[in-house]
Amino acid sequence: MATRSPSVVISDDEPGYDLDLFCIPNHYVEDLEKVFIPHGLIMDRTERLARDVMKEMGGHHIVALCVLKGGYKFFADLLDYIKALNRNSDRSIPMTVDFIRLKSYCNDQSTGDIKVIGGDDLSTLTGKNVLIVEDIIDTGKTMQTLLSLVKQYSPKMVKVASLLVKRTSRSVGYRPDFVGFEIPDKFVVGYALDYNEYFRDLNHVCVISETGKA
């Protein structure tokens, strides 16, 4: 029986890194508190996750399903590593991609209202190994909604990879199969994670400041 892969656990008292140690766009400096996960660490961890995914799912056609918008950077980098492994393997498998968008956030609080945008034609998932790629799992309600939708199409297997999982009292207890980092309950931005569409262009995962939320 498959088990969920371990993650890098970042403690509640993790101080992070001073902004001036990294290249941060000037227009964001006042809006950020600290760098929480540097880009290089994200990439190294993503490379390992790709190996875990291929070990678990690499025996059958994979459909990689990206959760937009926040998941696109992690999705692209994870797939690059998976494709590299696939190219250099004695037994390569076909891989296709699809996209879906879920809306559950308003400002820095989860509203509890989840809207599924797209996914009108997910019949291609039938009989396939489906890898859902998400940027962050907060309460877990959003992912549970998506999983119930995907399973209606009778895939052979469904696994979820998320770059981040928050430790929060609001969690419904859901945990993905592949997790990059388990983090404290802080509002983070960067590496395509946004705050009202800002900060997606940051390379690092950073903690937003109160000024940034204003």
From Swiss-Prot:
Signal peptide residue numbers: none
UniProt crosslink position (Glycyl lysine isopeptide (Lys-Gly) (interchain with G-Cter in SUMO1)): K115
Residue numbers carrying Phosphothreonine: T142
Enzyme Commission code: 2.4.2.8
Domain of life: Eukaryota
Annotated positions of the N-acetylalanine modification: A2
Main localisation: cytoplasm
GO CC, one annotated term: cytoplasm
Listed GO biological process terms: GMP catabolic process; GMP salvage; guanine salvage; hypoxanthine metabolic process; hypoxanthine salvage; IMP metabolic process; IMP salvage; positive regulation of dopamine metabolic process
Entry binding sites for Mg(2+): D194
Keywords linked to the UniProt accession: Acetylation, Cytoplasm, Glycosyltransferase, Isopeptide bond, Magnesium, Metal-binding, Nucleotide-binding, Phosphoprotein, Purine salvage, Transferase, Ubl conjugation
Catalysed reactions listed for this entry: IMP + diphosphate = hypoxanthine + 5-phospho-alpha-D-ribose 1-diphosphate; GMP + diphosphate = guanine + 5-phospho-alpha-D-ribose 1-diphosphate
Placement of covalent cross-link Glycyl lysine isopeptide (Lys-Gly) (interchain with G-Cter in SUMO2): K115
N6-acetyllysine, modified sites: K103
Pathway: Purine metabolism; IMP biosynthesis via salvage pathway; IMP from hypoxanthine: step 1/1
One GO MF term attached to the UniProt entry: guanine phosphoribosyltransferase activity
Role of this protein: Converts guanine to guanosine monophosphate, and hypoxanthine to inosine monophosphate. Transfers the 5-phosphoribosyl group from 5-phosphoribosylpyrophosphate onto the purine. Plays a central role in the generation of purine nucleotides through the purine salvage pathway.
Quaternary structure and interacting proteins, as annotated: Homotetramer.
Protein name, as recorded: Hypoxanthine-guanine phosphoribosyltransferase
